[in-house]
A protein has these predicted regions:
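Conserved active-site and cofactor/substrate-binding residues in soluble primary-metabolism enzymes
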Residues: 3-4, 33, 37, 41, ...
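Glycine-rich phosphate/diphosphate-binding loops and the adjacent beta-loop-alpha structural elements
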Residues: 22-50, 134-141, 167-173, 204, ...
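C-terminal functional extensions of proteins
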Residues: 175-289
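Structural motif
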Residues: 130-132, 161-163, 198
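Active-site gating loop/helix substructures
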Residues: 76-137
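Electropositive, gly/pro-rich neighborhoods at or near active sites that engage anionic ligands
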Residues: 1-101, 256-258, 271-289
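Conserved phosphate- and dinucleotide-binding cores of soluble alpha/beta proteins
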Residues: 1, 124, 136, 140-193, ...
Length: 289
C-alpha cells in the first residue's frame, strides 16, 4: 500500500522534523483533498513525473536523503480481500478490520500480480529478511500474497526474522498471541520459513492496559514454547517504549537485531566493511541510551 511505502521512506530518511511531519500530514476540512496524505500524493506525483513508481521512489529517496532503498513488491494496483472464518469475504484494506470477524486467510486481486524484479533480487541477495512489526493481515502478509515475492522468500538463504507486534489490533488480531501471528504467516507462505521470532516479554503498565482496553486491544502473549515447537528460535526481550503508547522501543529493537547479526557472524557473508563499521558504531550508541 502507498502508506507503507511512505512510512518506509520516512523511517529511512535523514530528515528534518518538519519534513517528517509534512510527509505524514493528512489534509483536513471539506476540500477534495480532505483525508488524503501529502506523502502519498507526493509519491504519486513523483511516480508520474519520473515515468513509473520505482523511478518515483528513487527520486523521492534522493529528496529525503534516504539511507537504503525502498522497493515495492509489485507495481500493479491490487485490492486485498479477506476470507473470514464464517465464510464471508471482505474486500478492501480499510474494510477488513471494520468487520470485526476472525480472518481465515488473505488474498488479493488480481491474484497474478507480478513481483518487481528488483524486489525479488533484493530478497535473494539479502543476508537477513525482517518481517514486521506492523498490521499482520494488511501490511505484513500482503507481501507474501505476491507469488514471486513468496517464492523468493522461501528460496532465499537469508536468516528470516519476524518481529511480533506487542499489542493486538482490533478487527485483525483480536485474541491473538504471538503463536497465532506466526501461524498466520506460515499459513500464507504455505510452509514454515522463519528462523527467529522476536517477542516482547515486558509487562504493560496498568495505566497503559486500561487505555488500550477501551479500544479492544490487549498485550500479545509471547507463547515461547508453542512457537519453539514449530522449529523456530524465539528471542524474548523487554521491547516496550517508556512512552504512554505501547510501542516497540526502536533503540532496543535495533540492538536485539544487531546483536543477532554479530552472534550469527552474518557480516562475513555479504555485508561490506563500511556497513560492519557502521553497525559497530550503532551498537556503541545504542548501549549509551
Amino acid at each position: 500500500p502507498p502508506g507503507d511505502l511512505r512510512n518506509c521512506l520516512v523511517a529511512l530518511a535523514d530528515r528534518e522534523p518538519l519534513m517528517e511531519r509534512i510527509m505524514q500530514y493528512r489534509f483536513k476540512g471539506d476540500s477534495p483533498l480532505a483525508g488524503h496524505s501529502f506523502g502519498n500524493l507526493f509519491i504519486a506525483a513523483m511516480a508520474e513525473a519520473e515515468g513509473g513508481m520505482e523511478a518515483g521512489l528513487s527520486a523521492t529517496s534522493q529528496i529525503l536523503n534516504v539511507r537504503g532503498k525502498v522497493v515495492p513488491s509489485t507495481l500493479r494496483d491490487i485490492r486485498l480481500k479477506a476470507e473470514m472464518t464464517d465464510g464471508s469475504i471482505i474486500n478492501g484494506e480499510s474494510e477488513i478490520p471494520k468487520a470485526h470477524k476472525r480472518i481465515r486467510t488473505m488474498a488479493m486481486e488480481p491474484a497474478d500480480a507480478p513481483a518487481t524484479a528488483s524486489a525479488v533480487q533484493a530478497i535473494l541477495n539479502a543476508d537477513i529478511l525482517i518481517f514486521g512489526p506492523g498490521s499482520l493481515y494488511t501490511s505484513v502478509i500482503p507481501n507474501l500474497l505476491v507469488t514471486g515475492i513468496r517464492d523468493a522468500v522461501i528460496k532465499s538463504e537469508a536468516v528470516k526474522i519476524y518481529i511480533c507486534n506487542v499489542m493486538t489490533q482490533p478487527g485483525e488480531t483480536d485474541g491473538y498471541g504471538a503463536f497465532e501471528h506466526v501461524q498466520a504467516l506460515i499459513q500464507q507462505a504455505g510452509t514454515q520459513f522463519l528462523d527467529y521470532v522476536i517477542v516482547n516479554d515486558q509487562r504493560v503498565t496498568a495505566a497503559q492496559l486500561a487505555q488500550y482496553n477501551e479500544k479492544g486491544s490487549m498485550p500479545v502473549t509471547p507463547d515461547i514454547k508453542k512457537i519453539e515447537r514449530l522449529g523456530i528460535q524465539v528471542i524474548p526481550t523487554r521491547l516496550i517504549s517508556n512512552k504512554d503508547l505501547v510501542r516497540h522501543n526502536p533503540q532496543k529493537l535495533a540492538q536485539v537485531i544487531i546483536s543477532l547479526v554479530y552472534r550469527l557472524r552474518l557480516f562475513g557473508k555479504g555485508i561490506q566493511f563500511f556497513d560492519y563499521f557502521f553497525m559497530r558504531q550503532s551498537m556503541r550508541e545504542l548501549k549509551k541510551k
